[in-house]
Amino acid sequence: MGKVRTGLSVSLDGFISGPNDGPEAPMGVGGERLLAWYSAGDTEYTLPGTDMVFRVSPQTAEYLAETRATTGAMVFGRRTFDLTHGWGGKHPLDKPVFVVTSSVPQDWVYEGSPFTFVTDGLESAVEQAKAVAGDKDVGVGAASIVQQCIKAGLLDEIHMDLVHVLLGGGVSLFDHLETGPIDLERTRVIEGAGVTHLTFRVMK
């Protein structure tokens, strides 16, 4: 059985996007700095099945390839789905996506695409994603879904692409936890160009 884990770019002060994010500016004001590491290196990495080409460090290229290979499904909230316009019917990682929502969007035009709209809660979405992922991991995002997973005891690992910048405001990854201290075990550190890839096991 795979793990339930995050996979997000985060500023040093804990934000995953800048202030005033919305459909026209999904990363908010200044939030594009969180993605600068995708072009900060000298090793070319092409995301399979897309025309997305990154220039990263060799270590980051290996990390990105590994992340794609070990991900079997993903869970997102409706807000992230709306901000990204549903990724045009295909997530860049080309994995099944489960969207936690109170209602199925009526204007969804990508019938047959690997998107499942789950209206009976987060735990149901995670269980469905795990069933599809099999031995691979389930990636969860963004902030609200991560926080809910932590509070529900569903999150196994935190994978964090720590970007060397202070945003000063925006959407906080670990806001609204209200669960007291949560112990983590650091299990991996990968230094890249403009980013440090960190993995923590959530102690349960």
For the regions a language model picked out, list residue spans one by one.
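Enzymes that bind and transform nitrogen-containing heteroaromatic metabolites
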Residues: 1-204
